[in-house]
Amino acid sequence: MVSRGTRIGWSLLCAFLCLGVACAHNGPEHQIEALSERLIREGASADVLLERAIEYRVLGKLKEAARDLQRAVRLAPSDSLVLLELAQIELQRRRGPEALLWVRQALQIPGLDTGERAAILMIRSHCRAAEGSKLEALEDCSEALKWNPQLISAYLERSAWQQRLQRPRERILGLEEGIRRTGAGLLVAERIEALLDDAQWQQALDAIEPELTSSRLQGTWKIRRARALKGLSRRTEADRDLQSALEEIELRMPREVKDSSLLMDRAFARELLGQTEAAIQDYKLAARCGGGEEAIEAGRRLRRTRSGRPLWPWRT
């Protein structure tokens, strides 16, 4: 018997393959038409309704996607993939309480494997976040990791919540645990960010040096090293790193469609150099290019500091 986790993996793969074929040929509209004809010909099934819901989501038709998924749930009330997709759609529709109801139903499914349960708990964390329950969102990330210690995204999201809740030591220890369990480079970088946020300048610098040596693209790592160097009052070296990072970013920046991650790096480098207005403009542009809430909040924070108050603990 094929486990539900395996079926979910294959279902997701098939959904993405269908999406790729649809986009490459006649687009989601054609795929929706074909799936609708199939539903008429063969009768309703949860799998086909799920496929059509995914196509509707691609088109931004979230109401139609939710309607299909609700039908799918009635046909297959113990299908965790359908319930998770519906919960995510409801979150996109800003219907957090409804999303949480579907998550609760998913958690009650008998025989969930560890990967499924962890995925459901992460969706519940997003529901908690949507309702402003930061501590509960953090706890869900930690619980998800008990079920699936290899879930890198859960370590990263937990780290973000620990930062917001001002739990620096807990954040660092959690990331170190994740690195031991997964060896993920993303967690190595996040740990260094956590050390910097906690003003552990020398520890951060010691961790940055080997990463910088082995990295082909060094701009982001030089910005991190500059931050540590400034914390150690080594301003001349820090400014040299920042100028070098800016030069690399300019070479990598596309001329037409701007890259939000590069814009965020450039903004932060300019901020550390004291180029406040230029940094604010970069944060604004990053927000328009997909930088999300992080870019918006960084711009707001920097605008609040125009009065001349220190931006960072090491700035005088």
State each model region's role:
Residues 38, 71-72, 105-106, 110, ...:
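Canonical positions in the second alpha-helix
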Residues 43-44, 77, 111, 115, ...:
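Short coil turns that delineate tetratricopeptide repeat
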Residues 47, 81, 115, 119, ...:
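Start-of-helix register in tetratricopeptide repeats
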Residues 51, 85, 116-119, 123, ...:
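Canonical tetratricopeptide repeat
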Residues 54, 88, 126, 160, ...:
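Residue-level recognition of tetratricopeptide repeat
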Residues 58, 92-93, 123-126, 130, ...:
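Register position in tetratricopeptide repeats
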Residues 272, 280-316:
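Terminal, low-structured helical/coil segments at or just beyond the last alpha-helical repeat
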